[in-house]
Amino acid sequence: MSQYKCLNPISQTGLGLFGEEYKQTEELNDADAILVRSAKMHDMELPENVKVIARAGAGVNNIPVEQCAENGIVVFNTPGANANGVKELVLAGMLLASRDIVGGIEWVAHEEDKEHIDKLAEKQKKQFAGCEISGKKLGIIGLGAIGAMVANSATHLGMEVYGYDPFISIDAAWNLSRTIKHSKSLDEIYSQCDYITIHVPLTDNTRKMIDKEAFTKMKEGVVLLNFARDLLVDEEALIEALDSGKVKKYVTDFANPLVAGRPGILVTPHLGASTAESEENCAVMAVKEVRDFLENGNIKNSVNFPNCDMGTCIAVGRITICHKNIPNMISQFTKILGSEGLNIADMTNKSRGSYAYTIIDLESAASKEALDELKAIEGVSKVRVIK
């Protein structure tokens, strides 16, 4: 029986998919798998028995991904599972930035003369007037699951949509509306668009990508939306752009002391994936990924190892090996297995950056001695037998 530990509350809709072969545990030392949402894991010491971590969400900044790869722990996320929830909040953010809906609601709530509120409203409504988003130009930086959904929905709302993503996947490209215009550079987005929304992961290359130079290239009175990661925007430069009028509104899902309560900035408390549907979708996908990995050794949607799939395990002995992506690894594996008289029925090897993953189906079970020899190979971090 495999055991899993939840570091955060995980939807029972997802956990229910584990079935009787799995047991939830509170002890990290007993866990084969960890499910997590927002818990910080960088200071955690992960025991040898942990084989997989599944993040019920897209971002993995709270997980020591590289350290896990070094120790042969496969880290999954759930790309696209919360995409619709985030998309809807982005669309709401554009509307809130275009029409002073929040200001109007607050005025009604705090107006003391409620008896004559209907007449007062007619007099005061002009101060909350705004503009429509239909006919405006929207620039989308990053056309992954969320960005693509925002793009398609915005076209249905009558917006002229421009997309920039030099790394767009084939699947994402197929799902995009034909009306979306392809921008070849960020400068095209900056110079043409009335609204700009960011949908890229946080990396060393994207950290503070929206900086002072970027703001100088944008249209006067642009609306900027950030529902991806807070550190994508240089907020010191943002404040300058707001004060100068270059940026009309900044809408973000990431509260911090610099932006909270500041005029011209609308901040939500990280609500992007805070819907019942998103939480269920993320939990379901995470549990399915964990089960397929533990039961079959397959990897899909890992952030530190390559996708690798050999289907349902029907072999007498299936071995999975996490190892460094260096020469002469496969030959060492096959030499050890061959010397034990073990015949390989099927095998696949995939690599991603510095790490690789190998699945081997044997016609008979490997001995403990053979497994120990595999584990002893320099560059091998974890060897597992699928039973």
Regions found by a protein language model. Give the residues of each.
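NAD(P)-dependent dehydrogenase/reductase Rossmann-like domain
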Residues: Y250, P263, L271-K387
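An N-terminal-biased, well-structured beta-alpha scaffold segment characteristic
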Residues: M1-T78, D211-E213, V223, D234-E236, ...
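Phosphate-binding beta-alpha-beta segment of Rossmann-like dinucleotide-binding domains, i.e.
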Residues: N71, P79-K137, N301-V303
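Glycine-rich Rossmann-fold phosphate-binding loop(s) that bind the pyrophosphate
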Residues: K136, L143-G144
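N-terminal Rossmann-fold NAD(P) dinucleotide-binding loop
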Residues: G147-A148
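Rossmann-like adenosine-cofactor binding region
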Residues: H42-E45, P166-V259, S274
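Oxidoreductase and adenylate-handling cofactor-binding alpha/beta cores
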Residues: K87-E106, N152-M159, M285-N298, T334-G338
